[in-house]
């Protein structure tokens, strides 16, 4: 029997936030698979999180919509492979199974075994999956063993990961990817503040970040105040970046965000997206 405690409660809460999206006045996406990975406890936690600190669930909702569009546009532009990196219960491989791209997943063994068990119970097949700690594994090589073509145009969705990772691990990992994958676009979310030193411009910024950590019951060791680090220390260019708060108008939720207190809006501005493209 798979020990779901090895997966972590956060994955179930994130799935529950997605599962509760139809309850919103203006839903941003439809994820019919999310309830498979939810339960009463996780849904209660998601509702409590939304009531106590709405920006935390707004972040998840906005990023889900953003990464959906990243995949859709990338496939339209010719990408033929999509890698879901550390995606937990991400079901985009099934949402976009008829879009003309091959999907692959990379995550910890406990996560993917549990996911495979749930999918099997629902008559759905897990896509080719590499069971690994991606920071330590040969990801391109491991995926190639599953039918992945490292030379083909590839999208990588790196959602909800960077802020949890040891800062010293990220550039070596990206350089390993770049050395084997010449046509790679990788999208991720991040906090645009220096979480390593915890030196913020103002005490208010620190308090905002700590508020998110408390809401998510997590600690974030890594942020990127300057995206040029990816261009200096790895062979990538920044193809796209911005704050999730700026997407509120596009998503039809500008009025909702405008009504947030100043602190909440400033918190959303710290949470950003970035797309890197192999040079």
Regions found by a protein language model. Give the residues of each.
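A short, conserved alpha-helix within the catalytic core of class I
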Residues: 138-140, 164-177
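Rossmann-like AdoMet
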Residues: 1-83, 87-132, 150
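A short SAM/SAH-binding and catalytic strip from SAM-dependent methyltransferases
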Residues: 153-168
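Short amphipathic alpha-helix with an adjacent loop that forms part of the alpha/beta core around
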Residues: 139-150
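Conserved beta-strand signature within the Rossmann-like core of class I S-adenosyl-L-methionine
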Residues: 180-194
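Rossmann-like AdoMet/SAM-dependent catalytic core
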Residues: 199-279
């Amino acid at each position: 029997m798979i020990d779901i405690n090895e997966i972590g409660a956060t994955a179930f809460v994130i799935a529950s936030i997605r599962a509760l999206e139809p309850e919103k006045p203006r839903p941003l996406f439809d994820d019919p698979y999310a309830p498979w990975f939810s339960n009463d406890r996780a849904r209660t936690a998601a509702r409590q999180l939304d009531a106590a600190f709405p920006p935390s669930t707004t972040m998840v909702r906005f990023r889900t919509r953003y990464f959906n569009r990243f995949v859709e546009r990338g496939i339209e532009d010719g990408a033929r492979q999509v890698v879901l990196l550390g995606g937990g219960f991400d079901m985009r491989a099934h949402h976009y199974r008829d879009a003309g791209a091959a999907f692959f997943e990379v995550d910890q063994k406990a996560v993917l075994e549990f996911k495979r068990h749930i999918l099997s119970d629902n008559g759905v097949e897990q896509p080719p999956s590499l069971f690994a700690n991606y920071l330590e594994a040969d990801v391109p090589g491991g995926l190639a063993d599953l039918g992945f073509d490292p030379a083909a145009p590839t999208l990588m969705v790196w959602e909800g990961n960077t802020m949890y990772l040891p800062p010293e691990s990220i550039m070596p990992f990206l350089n390993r990817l770049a050395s084997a994958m010449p046509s790679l676009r990788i999208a991720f979310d991040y906090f645009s503040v220096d979480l390593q030193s915890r030196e913020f411009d103002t005490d208010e910024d620190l308090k905002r970040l700590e508020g998110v950590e408390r809401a998510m019951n997590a600690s974030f060791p890594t942020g990127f105040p300057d995206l040029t680090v990816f261009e200096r220390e790895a062979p990538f260019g920044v193809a796209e970046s911005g704050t999730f708060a700026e997407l509120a108008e596009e998503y039809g939720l500008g009025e909702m965000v405008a009504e947030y207190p100043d602190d909440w809006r400033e918190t959303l501005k710290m949470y950003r997206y970035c797309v890197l493209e192999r040079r």
